[in-house]
Amino acid sequence: MESRYYHAKNVFIDSIEIDDYIALDSSVISYKQLQHSIEKPLKMILVFGRPGTGKSILLNYLYENLKYQKDIHYFATPTTNEEEFFHKIFKVITKKNLPSNTRVNFSTLVDYCRDIQGKREIVVLLDEAQMYSAEMMERIRLLSDSRSIKFIIALHKTDQEDLIAKEHFQSRIWEVVELRNGTLEDTQNYIHKKLLKKNLFEIANSIKSYHIGLIYKFSKGNYRETNKILFTIFEIYEYYDLHNKNKIDENSFSKKIIEMAAIKLGFIHV
């Protein structure tokens, strides 16, 4: 027999799929800012934020919304092999494949980009850009200087990546979209909207402001941490629902189970 908490648990599997995008006030503002930035004559745009603030799903949402309107390409997984990466870039720019054993002539590629300036405007979304080497970042910068290809680069906000951004792109990035952890209100809307989207009305209604406040205390409004906590909460609920049902009240959300999840994840030390 399948527990209803199984479906609630799966709602909070960390994902960048478009169907899992939740439109919060803050995320809508970030999306509109990014969409507006694409229309400006900018060569590079930086999407900046701590891990778990929604950079990947924002890029994917942008790509899915614009892929039939613009010459836009999304590199969701970093390709750290320079030769492989520029094979992909070559295909994006020239719309042709190179034989696998052929190296990209970078100077020729830059010249090609200059030749198509004003004829095409290519947008490349690079996620997890902190994985690219300094040399690759420099070549990305040189390609962007051609003004026929625009890069939107997502970076984790850490001290090291802050330095990378300043060193390599300070004079070329004219727009920065910074994503932050959500507020208490964002967290409440996020949790409720995720559950309501899957028609889990009773469970959503059982999670009151007090419970949200406790979850927020542990997650600090970070969406990845919020997902982890809720997934673990419903995993515990699912276990009791299947094996010891009298331990849970289906009509009331449990502070004790929130704390059990927090202990399991290391937010509370005992």
Residue ranges and their predicted role:
Residues A76, W174-T187:
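Conserved AAA+ ATPase "SRH/arginine-finger" region at the nucleotide-binding site
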